Amino acid sequence: MQVSVETTQGLGRRVTITIAADSIETAVKSELVNVAKKVRIDGFRKGKVPMNIVAQRYGASVRQDVLGDLMSRNFIDAIIKEKINPAGAPTYVPGEYKLGEDFTYSVEFEVYPEVELQGLEAIEVEKPIVEVTDADVDGMLDTLRKQQATWKEKDGAVEAEDRVTIDFTGSVDGEEFEGGKASDFVLAMGQGRMIPGFEDGIKGHKAGEEFTIDVTFPEEYHAENLKGKAAKFAINLKKVEERELPELTAEFIKRFGVEDGSVEGLRAEVRKNMERELKSAIRNRVKSQAIEGLVKANDIDVPAALIDSEIDVLRRQAAQRFGGNEKQALELPRELFEEQAKRRVVVGLLLGEVIRTNELKADEERVKGLIEEMASAYEDPKEVIEFYSKNKELMDNMRNVALEEQAVEAVLAKAKVTEKETTFNELMN
């Protein structure tokens, strides 16, 4: 076997391989012998068909199969010998084959980039220092009560957290526009659903009033014909409602899994959940800064084959989220995913190099801790932990999560990490 390697462009490589004619003939004869042992031909017992008849009937197809197998095996031998690491599936380009002559073909593919990590000491990371306070717990209890609130009609003016039922008609330069009209539209105030100024124009009015408000569409508004335009909305305020928050009764508290129904038990459960969410948020904030710094400090070439593969993954994930099928997923334009796919590939390559250079392996104690932390959010943590322990795929996924965390910590060990005190709400919102 003769092998030559050339660079085509960037990460592109072409390996040209020549297989000696006698190697081909030896492999063909060997395969014909195997075929002769299995085939049945009228007039001959199984395994007793003369080789010339076997060759006459099956020679062409056997030769084609043998060439395909030799191309694959010789390519693998070549890249091992040349210490080449292909990224993605190779493309085989066969040359012209002539019986009794050497056979030359080429294989085109991309290789993984050579990554030499740099700039880790210049990465700056700000780690939030946060404590869950009693006031934070109070705020979360209020949120839980609001989520379970009922609505009661009121006679007074609209306030910031009320709910209104309105008819409205919008116009620009005196002309109504598409999508600018609705009847019996229910709007919960304070959630930012409408364009700036719309809710402010309703506040202070009472049910039964009809009025007009002036607003301006944002420059980034999705409808081209409305961007930056001044508009008027004729409003008919039909109903105003205010929240009625439930009391912290034992019955209400038990809905959240606090069996004794006590306020103290609910506060403890809420605090535990908030601290778990806080721990995760801090970890993610620090991780995102470390990865962002790593990416900025290391500009690497990315194999197109890896980006294509990642785009396929993102397409299928998008289709699953929206209830689509695989065919629909493949029809989604690649431009929707290309930037994210490239980013994910770059991050994967860089973290992979961090793992390699630091000789990291998944810490099983960390894996156990991650599973326990995740399971604590469920009603029966022991059942979740047992389910994970019996599922190899889930365990491998969690090991990958742990290994990624260890890689990020290796980056942080060299980065400039400063601490900044902040509040729970500032971090989470």
Swiss-Prot record:
InterPro entries: PPIase_dom_sf (IPR046357), PPIase_FKBP_dom (IPR001179), Trig_fac (IPR005215), Trigger_fac_C (IPR008880), Trigger_fac_C_sf (IPR037041), Trigger_fac_ribosome-bd_bac (IPR008881), Trigger_fac_ribosome-bd_sf (IPR036611), Trigger_fact/SurA_dom_sf (IPR027304). Keywords: Cell cycle, Cell division, Chaperone, Cytoplasm, Isomerase, Rotamase. It catalyses: [protein]-peptidylproline (omega=180) = [protein]-peptidylproline (omega=0). The keyword Isomerase applies. The keyword Cytoplasm applies. One of its GO terms (cellular component) is cytoplasm. It is found in: Cytoplasm. Its main location: cytoplasm. One of its GO terms (biological process) is protein transport. Residues 161-246 form the PPIase FKBP-type domain. Its EC number is 5.2.1.8. It comes from the Bacteria. One of its GO terms (molecular function) is ribosome binding. Involved in protein export. Acts as a chaperone by maintaining the newly synthesized protein in an open conformation. Functions as a peptidyl-prolyl cis-trans isomerase. Belongs to the FKBP-type PPIase family. Tig subfamily. Consists of 3 domains; the N-terminus binds the ribosome, the middle domain has PPIase activity, while the C-terminus has intrinsic chaperone activity on its own. PANTHER family: TRIGGER FACTOR CHAPERONE AND PEPTIDYL-PROLYL CIS/TRANS ISOMERASE (PTHR30560), TRIGGER FACTOR-LIKE PROTEIN TIG, CHLOROPLASTIC (PTHR30560:SF3). Homodimer and monomer. In vivo most of the ribosomes are in complex with monomeric TF. Uncomplexed TF, however, is in a monomer-dimer equilibrium with approximately two thirds of TF existing in a dimeric state. This is Trigger factor. It comes from Escherichia coli O1:K1 / APEC.
